[in-house]
Amino acid sequence: MRIVEVRELAVPLEGGVANAVVNFSEHTVSLVAVVTDVVRHGRRVAGLGFNSIGRFAQGGILRDRMIPRLLAAAPDSLLDAGGARFDAGKVLAVLLRNEKPGGHGDRAGAAAAIEQAIWDLNAKLADEPAYMTIARAFGRVPSGPVEVYTGGGYYYAPGTGQTLRDEFQRYRDMGFESFKMKIGGAPLLQDMKRVEEALDVAGSGDHLMVDANGRFDLETALAYAQELQPLALRWFEEIGDPLDYRLNAEVIEAYGGAVATGENLFSAIDTLNLVRFGGMRPGHDVFQMDPGLSYGITEYARMLQVLESHGFDRRQAIPHGGHLINLHVVVGLGLGACEAYPGVFQPFGGYSPQCEIRNARVRPSEAAGFGLEEKKELSAAIRRLLA
């Protein structure tokens, strides 16, 4: 059994939404297929993966460095001890051959696209959903339906006919009960009016989260924290620069409520530094590292080891992303909850119709692999990739 081809395709995100820092209208995602010599039903078995949402496609790194390394590797060196499956850890090591340590940026997403395609491939070879493959690999029992909340809460210009209240009411009608909204793209007073508008739909602070997308300096962060503190929100997310651990710790001390961060940290050592210096509290704060931006599920499991070795519960891990791959990761690894982007960040955001949302909980379908083929918004890109 061997890999015969690796294909990649840059797929643009649809919708043109923006947060306080980034406009996503120019963003792309790398969709990858790892094709094998195994033939079933007249077609070669291929694993699909992508590098999550928010960091651009990485075609250059994939084509120039990682795909050639993988195709040059001895086929047996990529297999597990039994020889019947691919070893994602061995694949990742090959992808990173001769890469210097540190600098965990775009290459982390490039590697993740391929590494996660290996998990999809192994699950298809076993004819089982990816969450079962993931759970077995790490000695876990898959969880049942997991809590799901909506990312969203964008800014709407007056006169557009759309409001934040309308957006969140739509999500509630779809079965969601907890909602996340953007802040930092308007003055504090205006943002607080938006928060009150969102609370009218959410019902209480423990069903509402706010996300500053790393925009705030310490002074602004503390001003927001003072206004938000009485509302007892579920969490205050990405307050300042992701690598400003001191700011994170100082806001935590002043704010008292739960904070969430980590989506822009891409390695186990970055996670360790957050734990050491960021003021994060066991049983209280939320870690949002995203496997698709962080070298894949292999490195993400190392991040969880860092958390648990420092007294944190893996249920404090709620990955960024809001897509099918991370849904399987949450179920397979027994994490706290998952995000969803209903109708946003297509064709990758959100889940397939087979993933029923009921009572604010969701579970993957029983399709083999991650079930990306069941997501109709992705079907055209997958057909193009595999043609």
Segments predicted by a language model, with ranges:
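Structured beta-strand/loop patches that form or line metal/cofactor-binding pockets in enzymes
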Residues: 1-60, 65, 348
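Short loop/turn motifs at secondary-structure junctions
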Residues: 2, 175, 229-235, 280-283, ...
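General beta-strand structural signal in soluble alpha/beta enzymes
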Residues: 49, 132-133, 150, 208-210, ...
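Metal-dependent enolase-superfamily TIM-barrel catalytic cores that perform enediolate-based chemistry
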Residues: 133-255
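Shared catalytic-loop signature of beta/alpha-barrel
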Residues: 243-366
